[in-house]
Amino acid sequence: MTQSIRVAVSTVILTLRRTESGDAVLALPLVLRTREPFADQWALPGGWLTTAESPVDASARTLSETTGLAPSYLEQLYAFGAVDRSPTRVVSIVYWALLRQDDVDAQSEAHRASGRAPENVRWFDIDDLPSLAFDHAKIIEYALWRLRNKVGYSRVAHGFLPSEFTLADLREAYEAILGKSLDPANFRRQVEASGNLLPTDRFRTGSHRPARLYRYNTDVALADRGPLGPEETSIR
Amino acid sequence: MTQSIRVAVSTVILTLRRTESGDAVLALPLVLRTREPFADQWALPGGWLTTAESPVDASARTLSETTGLAPSYLEQLYAFGAVDRSPTRVVSIVYWALLRQDDVDAQSEAHRASGRAPENVRWFDIDDLPSLAFDHAKIIEYALWRLRNKVGYSRVAHGFLPSEFTLADLREAYEAILGKSLDPANFRRQVEASGNLLPTDRFRTGSHRPARLYRYNTDVALADRGPLGPEETSIR
């Protein structure tokens, strides 16, 4: 049987970056398309699924080729397949990951040094996105919705933070994800009651009064992929 | 560009059915394959995605053709795309839904009466599945894992119940999903504290002492599809 339907992958990589005004905002990398359809418009990193690789491997490959980024875990976001989402019939399997800003900086720098980094990649704050190709605006909106839902019942914000962090760091990540301010005292009570955080003996010192550093309780696995093996869920 | 990758859909339909011994067990419909690959083995209802329909519409169509079932909402479970999951290269987008046993009975009966019901469909209890084609055993295992996870933070068990039910009915559904017995008093405390249930003025009477009927608090939508439209998420 011949099908005139092709399979593509796209990847939503979110990081928390500090603006010049000192705020933390969510940002993601986009690629300026050089050919039709949607030439000269921005799109998520991605490409065609090839015969010899799984969708998650294709996501990792195309992400690495364009941005140099190599997240330790890519989660499947959704398979988008509406009939009219592209001028030709394309089903896109979309993956997503959260990356710490320092990992983004290190991996991007190594990619530039390799001489293989394309010129047409740029990071955008999610509240200042350009016009997007295909249904990629909707895909990003869905990824942000999923992130906001997930932050309520999991340790997803950990993906933005170093191994040790202050409660103010964690609250700042939650505020950027949820797009609203949180009361510091309420936030402290809630995260302490959750049992997810363990206090360390260390403090961050600086211009403010010393703030205790916390780490996540790693008795619970961060990325529980359930019964699926690595061929369906992550990068080998 | 030509891709030798084809796109299929499959559907996992779960219901809670009562065995002859009076227990409630999870069950799902399977289709006996009549051709290669995996001829004479059981598989999930499904088929090829056609050019003019979205994956969720293809799931609804193939499910209806084989089983006569028409769930009001199909949720995307996962896109399975491992290279070796089929003798040829196939990406399967899998949807799932929960159906009440009385809806299953009514829709199956109407399908049989139509004269279009195929002979090769049968329901199986999930603890007594036959040998399955492709990676369908893993897909079912993943659907059950997702259901068990979801029951903890959502009203997913509602999909198995009529609009009014006793706490014993609800506990029985949870026990079938989780595969373990739950303490009746603890269970009552937890669901009452959740705020998800509203007591009615009605009682079920019969051979036992009268049991109060409850309904779900429908202030919260049961199936929150987020920012995705119906072309990606459900049946029109």
What is each model feature region?
Chain A
Residues V94-A97, A106-L147, V151, F160-A168, ...:
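NUDIX/MutT-family hydrolases
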Residues E172-S181:
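Short helix-coil junctions and helix-kink-helix linkers
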Residues L44-A52, G159:
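Short histidine-centered catalytic/ligand-binding loop motif
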Residues R18-T19, E36-F38, T50, L98-V104, ...:
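Short, charged/polar surface micro-motifs in flexible loops or helix N-caps
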Residues P199-R236:
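Long, intrinsically disordered, low-complexity Ser/Thr/Pro-rich regulatory/activation regions
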Residues V12-L14, Y95-W96, R122, Y214:
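Conserved hydrophobic/aromatic positions in well-ordered beta-strands
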Residues M1-W42:
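N-terminal strand-loop-strand
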Residues I5-V9, L26-A27, P55-A60, S64-R112, ...:
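Active-site segment of metal-dependent pyrophosphate-handling enzymes
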